[in-house]
Amino acid sequence: MSPVFPMLTVLTMFYYMCLRRRARTATRGDMMNSHRTIVSNSRTSPLNAEVVQYAKEVVDFSSHYGSENSMSYTMWNLAGVPNVFPSSGDFTQTAVFRTYGTWWDQCPSASLPFRRTPSSFQSQDYVELTFEQQVYPTAVHVLETYHPGAVIRILACSANPYSPNPPAEVRWEILWSERPMKVNASQARQFKPCIKQINFPTNLIRLEVNSSLLDYYTELDAVVLHGTKDKPLLSLKTALVDMNDLEDDDYEEKDGCEMDALNKKFSSAALGDGPHNGYFDKLPYELIQLILNHLSLPDLCRLAQTCRLLHQHCCDPLQYIHLNLQPYWARLDDTSLEFLQARCVLVQWLNLSWTGNRGFISVSGFSRFLKVCGSELVRLELSCSHFLNDTCLEVISEMCPNLQDLNLSSCDKLPPQAFGHIAKLCSLKRLVLYRTKVEQTALLSILNFCAELQHLSLGSCVMIEDYDVIASMIGAKCKNLRTLDLWRCKNITENGIAELASGCVLLEELDLGWCPTLQSSTGCFVRLARQLPNLQKLFLTANRSVCDTDIEELASNCTRLQQLDILGTRMVSPASLRKLLESCKDLSLLDVSFCSQIDNKAVLELNASFPKVFIKKSFTQ
């Protein structure tokens, strides 16, 4: 062969690698330019005119800043035409998620991360929206009005939520994805990422967000879906751009699609003996296990196919002590659980958050899995798992006697009677019931029997009639409680606070944000400061009665304080905040948004004196 041919091959490979590198390192701006290229090369004929539509309805979401019975700061604001755009600033008519930055990860209530979570999975929250007409998407525009840059993934679903007949198959496809990236723009923007063409029409779009790099809450105003009724024909140039995007190994659906193959890979017994296994059999069994601990679940599936020795190691139940299935929510189903079942008999941490919706996991499939794999479970994450019902919680209570950590956050379809089963889990130390329909009777039973609770989240639990009764029971029974979330509890008073403060003296974190019935004039906040010296986080968000006396008591008694939110108070002066900052050396977050006495000049002066403290002051244009 002529020497020129290998040289041509090398040059061709180098050129291809450059193309891939260029696609991987493209900025959002480059992608938007790429989007314009695609649009210009896929012009539709009049017979296939583009349909432009705003979201008709918000059908599911993981969290929001607002309450369950109003529209302010709720995800439901994403339905319909924009309310705020193109204005910028903090507006109640927008959709806002519950958290931002890394502040919640630094709190005493934060859970440890799961091992084996693929680096490509960075989503923290999601919202799903439906549209009137099914179309082949050509563009998805997100109107961001405050602290943009949280959206990191956009998906489309093949199921039509408005169809009277359930589909035989439900598919999710990633239209666009990117790792979290700091966006310097502070003004409102219309985010227009370059999306991938898919081969089915959709009217169900899902946005996934990561707010860890944001300086404050992101606010979304509307979502616009562009598409055609018939599948568009793209030019060769467009196809090349899309292919480069699809081949980006850093953040694509490769791992997300592995659950399709997972069922086959683990069940395959037709492994060739082969003459060699790379001398792995010379290594101690424990060392191989330690090495394999660093592999993601899909990589473990792939490795299991290489030789019998590694198949044995990859199927060892010790590899599944911690099992995080949340990254694979779009593909995980009953069959997946069935093939994982034999390998999960020793599982202690299990994350099924976001999984099983739209029929992917059945009650019987979940029950079968737990009956085999539940005996050793210590931690079970089930956030937004809408397949759960009364039977599922009964199975959890019977099959998981060692359970210490249960997260049912945003399982808002669980019937109230289901929560009574939780009282049987007497070893519970952490219970998250945020945005659930737990009722007072069931909760009182839980508190009575689960006396070892250390972390309890009751944020936005709207079915509880009297939070004073709940607070009294917490104070009487939960002496080891360290963190308590009462965000937007509607009727707690100074009486409940008194019982809580006297009974739970170990509290390190207390969220009383948007609790309108608490009044500083009753002395409730002074009592908290004097009786809870270990407080590290205190949120008194939107309580307009918080005053200088309360702040000064915190400065005198709660010197370990790290995070304080007093958004919306009219009664706090810069002088009292200075005392607080001087006394609380560990304070790192202070939110004084909409505090009428704390103007921008005061914030600048405090920032200059205490540069290590992040002082937040929101604004409305």
UniProtKB/Swiss-Prot annotation:
Localisation per UniProt entry: Cytoplasm; Nucleus; Mitochondrion outer membrane
Domain of life: Eukaryota
Principal location listed in the UniProt entry: cytoplasm
SMART domains in the cross-refs: FBOX, LRR_CC
One Gene Ontology term of the molecular function aspect: ubiquitin-like ligase-substrate adaptor activity
Sites of Asymmetric dimethylarginine modification: R28
CDD domains from the UniProt entry: F-box_FBXL4
Domain F-box as annotated: residue spans: 277-332
GO biological process: autophagy of mitochondrion; negative regulation of mitophagy
Keywords: Cytoplasm, Leucine-rich repeat, Membrane, Methylation, Mitochondrion, Mitochondrion outer membrane, Nucleus, Repeat, Ubl conjugation pathway
A cellular component annotation (GO) from this entry: mitochondrial outer membrane
Observed effect of gene inactivation: Fbxl4 knockout mice exhibit loss of mitochondria and perinatal lethality due to excessive basal mitophagy.
Start-end of each LRR repeat: 376-397, 402-421, 427-448, 452-474, 480-501, 504-524, 532-558, 559-583, 584-609
PANTHER family: F-BOX_LRR-REPEAT PROTEIN 4 (PTHR13318:SF152), PARTNER OF PAIRED, ISOFORM B-RELATED (PTHR13318)
Job of this protein: Substrate-recognition component of the mitochondria-localized SCF-FBXL4 ubiquitin E3 ligase complex that plays a role in the restriction of mitophagy by controlling the degradation of BNIP3 and NIX mitophagy receptors. Also rescues mitochondrial injury through reverting hyperactivation of DRP1-mediated mitochondrial fission.
Complex formation: Part of a SCF (SKP1-CUL1-F-box) protein ligase complex. Interacts with FAF2 and VCP. Interacts with PPTC7; this interaction promotes destruction of BNIP3 and NIX and mitophagy suppression.
Protein name: F-box/LRR-repeat protein 4
Lineage: Eukaryota, Metazoa, Chordata, Craniata, Vertebrata
